[in-house]
């Protein structure tokens, strides 16, 4: 999109890709974290470049977070469905323009997957943070990657790689008890090479103010 604007012959200002990771620590308010991410990711159907592209969840609270997402109307893709959506996210190595800003149910239909019409977000549970994993890319739609982290250091490492994949300087997000976990927060903000570090807040709204 930015390249197209720059080549249009008219003045344009553009920014880089986001690929925002959101970490959910085991001290986080899970209801707040999940509701915030849904609020952010469904705003404008995920077109805001600061919106969460991946959720990294500590193992201790992974199942609770997954249940909360499901209870809120998000759809967890099974392995076969995940593979189908993978093939729809990218076309020839680039983001598929047909999914940008579309509803979750529309993207599912494009992928040959059937979901309830009111589905808020499609969530693929994946492991790789490498660019070979389509879910590890910026998706600009109500599609999320969800990763399990064995501990906070593993979560930080995964987030760092996702940021590097998308390009440094954009946005990172974390949910935790900011009073008792100050050391984790300090390390997070020092390790994430992003201009915005958001704490316990929806990243779309945090990014655009």
Outline where the language-model segments fall.
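Short, hydrophobic/aliphatic alpha-helical segments
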Residues: 2-5, 204-206
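ALDH superfamily catalytic-core signature
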Residues: 3-130
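Conserved C-terminal structural/oligomerization subdomain of aldehyde/semialdehyde dehydrogenase
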Residues: 113-209
